[in-house]
């Protein structure tokens, strides 16, 4: 009994000592910052992070070591945040959330000071101030009454600030929140999300405030992430909201320079670009009958490269462009060495991303015998001699015409063994990460709008696959207008691809709840469709194409996050089975939502004759359950609002904001430190704990065949494409890398029904 009493007294003294230490640490931090108002945040942290490894004593000790006598109050708060960041480890990952709360306190303090100085006392006051300062587009106040804006202000939930980790909140604060002309923050995180929601809901004629709330909720709960341009530019005067643009470069001097101008304008307003150079004549080709005088594609690569450097994306990042060339183009060998470190530097372009378009025939021949000859042609010469453009075909018809060209002695050929071409491709890929791969036959077979054109290439991140055609000048006339002489050009706009992206954060969503998923997908589809109406287009050709097709790119992030929190290992059949169901459910919900929007607002211009209208889309993918058959009938009668729906982008920066894993990739590491402008930032796998630690496996340690198999399963449910990264180590041989490329073709070429049977 005496022993029990002694132990009981010991526990009492221990708890008393712990309380004393907590009060001491609390007092030490408050004194160190010189700010009594921080006490509430610190007490919340003590309550929400009760583990002894998150004791404020550790924070106080680290903070004290950073403090210097001559620090300002702002510098002391920054030191406190830094202390929490540096306490973050894979054993104590929640310090990153504590750091985020302290960072948010610091941000809120600055915002309060800014608001008081500007006489801002309500959300409407803030919007009026931002509009008057030219930081907000005047269309928000023109579209909503003061009463509506104050009602919308009631939707804001500051508690959702706690969802952020430090990396996400820090990135959001530095790159996405609106700042004053003196670079001070003037907008909170929740105000940013509400401002975006107000903008996205503007086209709604009925229940508009309800849609504002729905858009705000899915954004602020981090259930979805909009593309970087939408996050950065929605609600602003220049509201360019689209990420991806693709141009078909014609084989003419005027056309090439027009494409360069298009790229410059897209980059100026924050868009990334894909450029198809497969129509441009090769080096040594003829020009106006003069033999051997064409400079080829590589000379133009230098201009594209310099444009990317000269015209950055609103000062936020360097211009970004992927340049595509067909694997049968005569300039391919030089093209494959654009970014390598050896060779003539005058033939290099280190700031662009080369990409190659492959027909199935190339990979089949590579699999059968690497010593076979592959023949390269000049596209202009084929057009001149044969009367057709080889790049305008795919599948069996392309193969027949390719062999026709091979056997035509009138055509000059550049012949190489497939082994030599593959060696160039893989060496460049291992050294530089490029060229990107675009399997054109697979893409065109799955194109639901093949009745209106062909897909030559993809965008910067290889997830967009839509009909393409060149912009052409029809005529140039000299006219008189109001007494002045003017030059009038008539231009055929072609199909200048533009796509509006957003991603479902799978790690934050109730994937098993079919009803909730349908509602959230439908909300996001509506938001993306509204982007088409609201967008500020950098060039008119993009606006024309976007309104014809109304294409969107609904994708996914947090893929590995979603698997880990469910205890599903990447290298498992359970992974494939689970994600097969998830993406089928997402696809069903997206198609149903687009069809309902078509009923409400009208179908896209080219719906008639599409695979959507004929039902071929559903038959090709083996969607034959009663639910799918009923949806196919509904789509055929109601129409589709959007020609293209699903596309999976890599989502690197927006995934950081949402505190989840990037795209559909495995995590790089469970924990690592990343250097950013002299600071070391912790990167922690989402929801890292004893339960998820062994579920997360580094991308470089993962068997890449599982990633390829998973991509094949997902592709059944995606009408466009997906960005797939392969993580290759120095231990890989070139043969092993080639086998992965061949495996990609195996898991995407068969019909979906064959895929399901053989999985």
What are the functions of these language-model segments?
Residues 178, 196-208, 216-242, 246-289, ...:
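Function-dense linear segments that define catalytic or interfacial modules
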Residues 114-203, 280, 289-303, 313-319, ...:
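Conserved, charged catalytic cores of large soluble enzymes
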Residues 148-151, 162-170, 465, 528-533, ...:
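Catalytic alpha/beta core of large soluble enzyme barrels
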Residues 2-3, 7-16, 747-754:
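Conserved small/polar residues in nucleotide/adenosyl-binding loops
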Residues 29-33, 184-187, 206, 210, ...:
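Alpha-helix capping and helix-loop boundary segments enriched in small/acidic/polar residues
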Residues 98-102, 106, 749, 753, ...:
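Terminal amphipathic helices with adjacent charged low-complexity linkers/tails
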Residues 17-35, 47-194, 210-216:
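Core nucleic-acid recognition elements
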Residues 260, 520-543, 551, 569-651, ...:
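Internal maturation/activation junctions in enzymes
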């Amino acid at each position: 009994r005496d022993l029990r009493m002694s132990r009981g007294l010991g526990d009492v003294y221990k708890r008393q000592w712990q309380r004393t230490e907590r009060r001491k640490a609390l007092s030490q931090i408050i004194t160190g910052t010189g700010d009594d108002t921080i006490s509430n945040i610190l007490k919340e942290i003590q309550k929400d992070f009760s583990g002894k490894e998150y004791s404020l004593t550790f924070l106080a000790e680290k903070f004290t070591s950073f403090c210097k006598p001559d620090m300002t109050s702002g510098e002391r708060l920054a030191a406190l945040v830094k202390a929490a960041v540096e306490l973050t480890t894979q054993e104590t990952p929640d310090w990153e959330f504590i750091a985020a709360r302290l960072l948010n306190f610091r941000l809120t303090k600055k915002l309060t000071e800014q608001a008081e100085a500007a006489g801002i006392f309500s959300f409407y006051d803030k919007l009026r101030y931002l509009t008057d300062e030219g930081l907000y587009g005047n269309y928000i106040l023109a579209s909503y009454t003061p009463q509506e804006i104050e009602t919308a202000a009631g939707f804001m939930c500051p508690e959702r600030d706690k969802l952020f980790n430090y990396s996400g909140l820090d990135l959001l604060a530095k790159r996405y929140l609106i700042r004053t002309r003196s670079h001070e923050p003037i907008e909170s995180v929740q105000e940013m999300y509400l401002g975006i929601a107000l903008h996205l809901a503007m086209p709604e004629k009925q229940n508009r405030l309800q849609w504002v709330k729905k858009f705000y909720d899915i954004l602020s709960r981090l259930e979805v992430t909009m593309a970087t341009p939408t996050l950065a530019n929605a609600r602003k005067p220049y509201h360019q909201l689209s990420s991806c643009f693709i141009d078909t470069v014609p084989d003419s001097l005027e056309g090439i320079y027009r494409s360069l101008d298009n790229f410059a304008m897209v980059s100026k307003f924050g868009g990334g670009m894909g450029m198809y150079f497969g129509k441009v004549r090769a080096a040594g080709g003829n020009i106006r009958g003069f033999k051997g005088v064409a400079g080829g594609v590589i000379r133009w690569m230098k201009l594209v490269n310099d444009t990317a450097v000269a015209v950055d994306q609103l000062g936020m990042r360097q211009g970004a462009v992927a340049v595509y060339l067909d694997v049968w183009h005569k300039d391919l060998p030089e093209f494959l060495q654009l970014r390598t470190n050896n060779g003539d530097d005058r033939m290099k372009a280190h700031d662009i991303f080369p990409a190659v378009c492959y027909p199935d025939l190339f990979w089949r021949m590579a699999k059968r015998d690497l010593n076979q000859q592959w023949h390269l042609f000049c596209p202009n010469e084929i057009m001149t001699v044969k009367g057709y453009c080889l790049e305008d075909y795919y599948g069996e018809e392309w193969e027949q015409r390719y062999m026709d060209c091979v056997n035509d002695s009138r055509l000059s050929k550049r012949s190489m063994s497939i082994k030599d071409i593959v060696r160039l491709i893989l060496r460049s890929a291992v050294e530089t990460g490029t060229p990107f791969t675009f399997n054109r036959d697979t893409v065109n077979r799955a194109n639901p709008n093949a009745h209106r054109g062909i897909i030559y290439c993809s965008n910067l991140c290889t997830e967009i696959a839509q009909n393409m055609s060149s912009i052409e000048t029809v005529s140039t006339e000299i006219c008189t207008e109001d007494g002045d002489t003017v030059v009038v050009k008539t231009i055929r706009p072609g199909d200048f691809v533009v796509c509006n992206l957003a991603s479902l954060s799978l790690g934050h969503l109730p994937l098993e709840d079919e009803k909730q998923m349908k509602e959230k997908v439908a909300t996001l589809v509506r938001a993306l469709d509204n982007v088409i109406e609201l967008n500020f287009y950098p060039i008119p050709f993009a606006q024309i194409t976007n309104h014809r097709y109304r294409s969107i790119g609904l994708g996914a992030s947090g893929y590995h996050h979603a698997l880990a929190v469910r205890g599903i290992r990447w290298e498992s059949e359970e992974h494939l089975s689970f994600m097969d169901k998830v993406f089928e459910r997402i696809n069903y919900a997206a198609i149903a939502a687009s069809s309902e929007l078509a009923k409400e607002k009208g179908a896209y211009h080219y719906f008639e004759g599409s695979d959507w209208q004929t039902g071929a889309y559903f038959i090709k993918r083996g969607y034959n359950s009663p639910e799918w058959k009923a949806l196919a009938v509904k789509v055929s009668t109601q129409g589709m609002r959007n020609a293209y729906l699903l596309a999976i982008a890599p989502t690197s920066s927006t995934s950081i904001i949402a505190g989840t894993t990037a795209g559909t990739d495995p995590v790089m590491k469970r924990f690592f430190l990343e250097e950013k402008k002299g600071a070391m930032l912790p990167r922690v796998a989402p929801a890292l704990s004893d339960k998820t630690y062994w579920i997360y496996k580094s991308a470089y340690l993962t068997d890449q065949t599982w990633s390829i198999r998973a991509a094949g399963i997902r592709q059944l449910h995606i009408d466009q494409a997906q960005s797939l990264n392969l993580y290759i180590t120095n231990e890989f041989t070139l043969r092993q890398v080639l086998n992965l490329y061949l495996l990609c073709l195996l898991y995407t070429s068969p019909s979906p029904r064959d895929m399901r049977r053989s999985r």
